[in-house]
């Protein structure tokens, strides 16, 4: 047992670390408050590479605000960001409580179909915040393949049949299935008869080590682990027994991987080391821009289709979530 001096030193070290985490969270939140658009949208950009190098162009989307409203819900300092993101999500909601990926700020947003991913994330975030959402459960569970997995797209051929046909000829396929999107559907709908095929498939993919073969749109195993963990931690704790050893052995390749890895460890009850994430924070309170997702990777394609999508604000959102979860674990230890 440590003596009194050692105990006081340990307490002092823990207090100092806690103060540094608090400061990093406040700086990150301040950056996000500045970056968040007047509409409440969290900005994201399109670039030719996963490193988001070269020319970048703004890409108005619903997705990042939905992610932020969920990820930052446990960060008291970010309450205003979450409220503004929820306001934005409510304005972007289409009939029946459905959403599409591009926001109405994008001139050709009607080209894109409604989708399961944005609908599940936005619905979960709004309901957790006590905001009203129409009963969209039936609309989501209809969008499943014969094997029970959720499709990416909520296909409505009318009132824009030519635009919809163009989208599915050049951009995507009506029967696209991505298990990260299934994870977000499970997170929203919970453990029920309609989601059990998706739960079983996620577990099978984890056991087989097939994470990157399970996603069309996302660019990192760390990202897959993060979204799977949000979906499965309360439903299938055995998933943590698979994810945690792999996560401990993996070396994050960039700030986004580092943030999602730290958050995922905390989701499964670990106390992550916050130091690498603290060290990666920049002087303006942000973390570096890294591509989170891309235009899709088909089975026979050696590389994902460009562009990639990411932003300093998006990485910072994940980092603030990670540090908040780390702080919570340290306080309860």
Identify the role of each PLM range.
Residues 40:
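Extracytoplasmic
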Residues 86-92:
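Patatin-like phospholipase
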Residues 137-145:
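Long, hydrophobic, well-ordered secondary-structure blocks that form the structural core
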Residues 2-27, 44-84, 99-133, 151-200, ...:
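An alpha-helical repeat/solenoid feature that recognizes helix-turn-helix modules
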Residues 32, 89, 140, 202, ...:
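Buried hydrophobic core positions in alpha-solenoid tandem helical repeats
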């Amino acid at each position: 047992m440590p003596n009194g001096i050692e105990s006081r030193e340990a307490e002092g070290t823990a207090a100092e670390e806690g103060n540094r985490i608090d400061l990093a969270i406040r700086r990150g939140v301040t950056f996000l408050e500045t970056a968040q658009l007047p509409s409440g949208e969290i900005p994201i950009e399109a670039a030719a590479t996963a490193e988001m190098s070269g020319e970048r162009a703004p890409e108005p989307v619903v997705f990042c605000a939905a992610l932020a409203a969920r990820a930052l819900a446990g960060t008291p300092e970010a309450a205003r960001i979450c409220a503004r993101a929820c306001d934005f999500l409510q304005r972007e909601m289409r009939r029946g409580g459905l959403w599409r990926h591009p926001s109405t700020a994008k001139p050709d947003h009607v080209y894109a179909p409604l989708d399961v991913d944005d609908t599940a994330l936005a619905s979960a975030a709004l309901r957790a915040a006590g905001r009203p959402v129409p009963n969209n459960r039936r609309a989501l569970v209809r969008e499943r393949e014969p094997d029970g997995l959720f499709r990416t797209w909520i296909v409505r051929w009318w009132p824009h049949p030519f635009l919809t046909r163009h989208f599915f000829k050049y951009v995507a396929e009506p029967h696209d299935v991505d298990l990260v999107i299934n994870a977000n559907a499970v997170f929203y709908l919970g453990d029920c008869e309609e989601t059990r095929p998706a739960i079983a498939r996620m577990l099978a993919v984890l056991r087989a080590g097939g994470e990157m073969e399970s996603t069309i749109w996302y660019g990192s195993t760390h990202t897959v682990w993060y979204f799977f963990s949000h979906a499965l931690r309360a439903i299938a704790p055995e998933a943590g027994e698979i994810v945690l050893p792999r996560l401990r052995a993996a070396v994050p390749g960039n700030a986004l991987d580092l943030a999602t890895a730290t958050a995922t460890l905390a989701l499964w009850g670990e106390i992550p080391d916050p130091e690498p994430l603290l060290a990666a924070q920049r002087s303006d309170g942000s973390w570096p821009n890294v591509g989170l997702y891309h235009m899709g990777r088909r089975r026979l394609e050696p590389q994902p289709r460009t562009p990639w999508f990411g932003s300093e604000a998006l990485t910072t959102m994940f980092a603030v979530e990670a540090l908040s979860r780390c702080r919570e674990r340290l306080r309860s230890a």
